Regions:
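N-terminal anchoring/stem segment of glycosyltransferases
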Residues: 1-80, 256, 261-263
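Conserved beta-strand termini and adjacent loop/short-helix elements that scaffold enzyme active sites
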Residues: 9, 47-49, 109, 200-204
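Short catalytic/ligand-binding loop motif for oxyanion handling, primarily in non-cytosolic enzymes
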Residues: 15-16, 53-55, 91-94, 99-100, ...
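Catalytic core and acceptor-binding pocket of nucleotide-sugar-dependent glycosyltransferases
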Residues: 66, 137-249
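GT-A fold catalytic core of metal-dependent nucleotide-sugar glycosyltransferases
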Residues: 60-122, 146, 151-152
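Short, flexible, basic/aromatic active-site loop/helix in glycosyltransferases
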Residues: 122-136
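Short amphipathic alpha-helical segments and helix-helix/interface helices
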Residues: 30-34, 68-69, 95-99, 186-187, ...
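Conserved beta-strand scaffold positions in the cores of enzyme catalytic domains, especially
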Residues: 44-46, 82-84, 106, 197-200, ...
Length: 263
């Protein structure tokens, strides 16, 4: 019987400890996704060892995108849908099963967090993709996406694209464009290959930059319920945009507050 898969990405690049302030938060975010799998009878696949050891030539963000099918198939899993989940994501203990909302399409969430960054990234990669006119309104974030076997060929060809042009991509991401790794190339590849991407799932399933949206606050005017907005109204909490050296501390504090719900 086919099962849905949570492909959780938790590779520790020790060379970036100073930049990211350690990876202690992995254990807390991972626990929420294991709980999800137990609730909804899904396979939990932990991608914690890179297939390519050179993390400069093969960034973690690239490896998660181009090797998801390879890793899952190597485990002999009879998979249905796959949710690729970054380690910065935490799922609420009683939130719904998003796999039931996909219509078996490729699912992503539109990225509006930094439109200038997105525009510059799109323009920077445009010459590589033969000046393809990418529809910016359908640009998605690659940190949480859902796909299935119907998208295997597209994702495997994306892997070939990178492996055949990795020196060019490294130059673009590290020297010329300096706006992301896999995300913008993946958006180009999905649109070039006419992949039908479902982008209308509620934002509750992907709350990003929560501090900028005041989601860590609560309704102080009523002063009845001090539950932060992101817990009350969100399902999938993404801890990005926070100073990276503070991320583990913030997530640990949250985990200590809510962990009893996952027992």
């Amino acid at each position: 019987m086919k099962r849905n898969v949570i492909f959780w990405v938790g590779i520790k690049n020790e060379n970036h400890n100073d930049k990211y302030g350690d990876f202690k938060y992995f254990e807390y975010t991972k626990a929420t996704w294991k709980h999800f799998c137990k609730r909804f009878d899904c396979e939990f696949v932990e991608f914690n060892e890179p297939l390519q050891k050179d993390l400069t030539e093969y960034r973690v963000n690239w490896q998660k995108a181009i090797y998801a099918f390879d890793v899952i198939e190597s485990l002999g899993i009879d998979y249905d849908q796959i949710a690729l989940v970054d380690s910065t994501c935490m799922y609420k203990w009683d939130a719904p099963n998003f796999f039931e909302l996909t219509d078996h399409k490729f699912v992503g969430w539109r990225d509006f967090d930094n439109m200038n960054w997105i525009y510059q990234s799109i323009q920077g990669y445009k010459p590589f993709f033969n000046d393809f006119k990418l529809n910016m309104t359908n640009y998605i974030n690659s940190g949480f996406i859902i796909f299935n076997e119907a998208h295997r060929e597209t994702m495997q060809s994306f892997k070939e694209l990178y492996e055949n042009n990795k020196q060019v991509f490294m130059q673009l991401q590290d020297v010329i464009v300096k706006k992301g790794n896999d995300q913008t190339p993946l958006n180009y590849w999905l649109q070039i290959n006419n992949v039908d991407v479902k982008t209308d799932l509620p934002m509750a399933y992907k709350l990003t930059h929560m501090h900028r949206r005041d989601l860590f606050k609560y309704n102080w005017q009523l002063n009845v319920d001090q539950t932060p907005y992101f817990i009350k109204y969100g399902y999938n909490w993404i801890f990005n945009g926070i100073p990276k050296h503070e991320r583990s501390q913030v997530i640990e504090q949250l985990w200590n507050f809510i962990k009893h719900n996952y027992e």
